[in-house]
Amino acid sequence: MTDIMTDTQKDTAAGAVPTRSGFVALIGATNAGKSTLVNRLVGAKVSIVSHKVQTTRAIIRGIAIHGSAQIVFMDTPGIFKPRRRLDRAMVTTAWGGAKDADLIMLLIDSERGIKGDAEAILEGLKEVHQPKVLVLNKVDQVRREDLLKLAAAANDVVAFERTFMISALTGSGCEDVMDYLAETLPEGPWYYPEDQISDLPMRQLAAEITREKLFLRLHQELPYASHVETEKWEERKDGSVRIEQVIYVERDSQKKIALGKGGEAIKAISTAARKEISEILEQPVHLFLFVKVRENWGDDPERFREMGLDFPK
């Protein structure tokens, strides 16, 4: 009988370091800093960030190489008490991502501590059997004595494999996280090409960037009542790209806010989004934004599919 060896086994037999790979789900309450941390660990912007809660709506995968390991980070929507259909879909997606991962990283905002949503997430993790690590974020804002108490309290509820204290904003402590993951993930071939940093299609990433600029520009409830889709993507002969996107809102009054006085708001959103998309593509971009009213788009299964979410019953 002939034994067949995988490439990884051949490398190991030859004395090379075996490759490792796996999926790491980042979960936590809204605005714990998950997207900022994913961007930091990947070394590039793969997930949009704003100061508003519920910015991340679907799982965004960011891919990092550390030594001989390929680490696929799953930036999940913040977990909170859902009130509407979209909320339920986001929370279900977050827990689903956790259960599909090789390892779970619970990110807790050290300034807020364990209360409300964070407390409920800890209780929920008792029913999830994947290995778990605790990551305390924003530790530069909290006394060490309080951090130790916070870590002890969380570990009293869930048996974490390790506890890390980091600042996603400055990068402090992040190298320790990467070292641990690179040593812990299972041996196996990489899932993605070495130069790939995300599995998000460019059309969807462009829509996410525009949605980020919408979040940053507009206030109150409008960002949560809006959705952005890329409807047209045309590569032009001169090397530029023409992109048409639609911002869906629920009411005429919201459309007026999105447009702004004399179109001021939509122009600012378009300029900021076009600049960033152009930098990512490394080619000129012509971005055209349209605002349309679609009542109850949050109850439309097609919109959920566009966002990468399952439509809850």
Swiss-Prot record:
Q: Does the keyword Cell cycle apply?
A: no
Location(s), subcellular: Cytoplasm; Cell inner membrane
Map out region (G4) in residue numbers.
Answer: 137-140
Describe the location of the Era-type G domain by residue ranges: 20-187
Q: Which residues bind GTP?
A: 28-35, 75-79, 137-140
Query: Which key words tag this protein in UniProt?
Result: Cell inner membrane, Cell membrane, Cytoplasm, GTP-binding, Membrane, Nucleotide-binding, Ribosome biogenesis, RNA-binding, rRNA-binding
Every copy of the KH type-2 domain together lies at: 218-295
Region described as G3: 75-78
Q: Name one GO cellular component term.
A: cytosol
| Superkingdom, natural source | Bacteria
Q: How does it sit in the membrane?
A: Peripheral membrane protein
* Chain positions covered by the region annotation G5: 166-168
- Where do the segments described as G1 lie? 28-35
Per the UniProt record, one Pfam family is MMR_HSR1
A GO MF term: small ribosomal subunit rRNA binding
Q: Does the keyword Glycoprotein apply?
A: no
Gene Ontology biological process terms, A to Z: ribosomal small subunit assembly
Report the HAMAP family cross-referenced here.
GTPase_Era
What family is reported?
Answer: Belongs to the TRAFAC class TrmE-Era-EngA-EngB-Septin-like GTPase superfamily. Era GTPase family.
What this protein is reported to do is described as: An essential GTPase that binds both GDP and GTP, with rapid nucleotide exchange. Plays a role in 16S rRNA processing and 30S ribosomal subunit biogenesis and possibly also in cell cycle regulation and energy metabolism.
Q: What is this protein called?
A: GTPase Era
- UniProt organism field: Rhizobium meliloti (strain 1021)
